[in-house]
């Protein structure tokens, strides 16, 4: 879910 970009829609809160 968390990667080089911000949290994307459809992902659980992880940032």
Swiss-Prot record:
Mark the residues carrying the PTM 4-hydroxyproline.
4, 13
Which tissues carry this protein? Expressed by the venom duct.
**Sites bearing Cysteine amide, chain numbering:** 15
Q: What is the disulfide pattern of this chain? A: 1-15, 2-11, 7-14
Q: Which UniProt keywords apply?
A: Amidation, Disulfide bond, Hydroxylation, Secreted, Toxin
User: A single Gene Ontology molecular function, please?
Assistant: toxin activity
Is-annotated flag, keyword Repressor? Answer: no
Asked if the Swiss-Prot or TrEMBL record annotates the protein with the keyword Secreted, the reply is yes
Q: Where in the cell is it found?
A: Secreted
For this entry, the protein name equals Conotoxin SI.6
Q: What phylogenetic lineage does the species belong to?
A: Eukaryota, Metazoa, Spiralia, Lophotrochozoa, Mollusca
């Amino acid at each position: 879910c968390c990667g080089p970009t911000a949290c994307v829609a459809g992902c659980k809160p992880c940032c």
